[in-house]
Amino acid sequence: MLSRGVCGTSRQLAPALGYLGSRQKHSLPDLPYDYGALEPHINAQIMQLHHSKHHAAYVNNLNVTEEKYQEALAKGDVTAQIALQPALKFNGGGHINHSIFWTNLSPNGGGEPKGELLEAIKRDFGSFDKFKEKLTAASVGVQGSGWGWLGFNKERGHLQIAACPNQDPLQGTTGLIPLLGIDVWEHAYYLQYKNVRPDYLKAIWNVINWENVTERYMACKK
């Protein structure tokens, strides 16, 4: 099972992807709200398919791939280990990303963050509105499928915006610790917003769980 810790998320798969001798299988996390709770901004059909089909597929495929990887390790088959890396990255990243995404959303979300997170956003982006514009632009600008992210650069102590293709996990790709992720795969919005990704990006700000994002930020500052 993927840990629900809020800091260093991508490192939580390290035991499973490295030493597999006593690994536990990953499982699909429960949503902290009903499928229809984010309406009208994200409808119930999208949420049901996104969680119970798409995320579940990443979990199942990750478990299968890890079993194959364990067999390759036991056999000392380096070629097979290398060949399995893309599937580990894709399905492991999909599991990490979606496990963060669900907690980043809330039917009681929207508005602005408070306290230290808001001050950090103002410091690093000028204002909350400028931050929204930059993260929206980065997310809309993803070519094909991927994610827009607000991450924390622990070395610099600053917030940064980044975009990752496909299911590449933010921390494993950039070193940034994920705080807020926006899924811009078509399965996240197409049934409701068709091919108009900007409309989906406009709507999702109404359900951002700033309490969760703040918890992640405060944990990573320690």
From Swiss-Prot:
Co-factor binding details: Binds 1 Mn(2+) ion per subunit.
PTM-bearing positions, type N6-acetyllysine: K68, K75, K114, K122, K130, K202
InterPro entries: Fe/Mn_Superoxide_Dismutase, Mn/Fe_SOD, Mn/Fe_SOD_BS, Mn/Fe_SOD_C, Mn/Fe_SOD_N, Mn/Fe_SOD_N_sf, SOD_C_sf
One Gene Ontology molecular-function label: superoxide dismutase activity
Record PTM 3'-nitrotyrosine, positions in chain: Y58
Top-level taxon of origin: Eukaryota
Top EC class for this record: oxidoreductase
N6-succinyllysine PTM sites in chain numbering: K68, K75, K122, K130
Role description: Destroys superoxide anion radicals which are normally produced within the cells and which are toxic to biological systems.
The protein's name: Superoxide dismutase [Mn], mitochondrial
Organism for this UniProt entry: Pongo pygmaeus
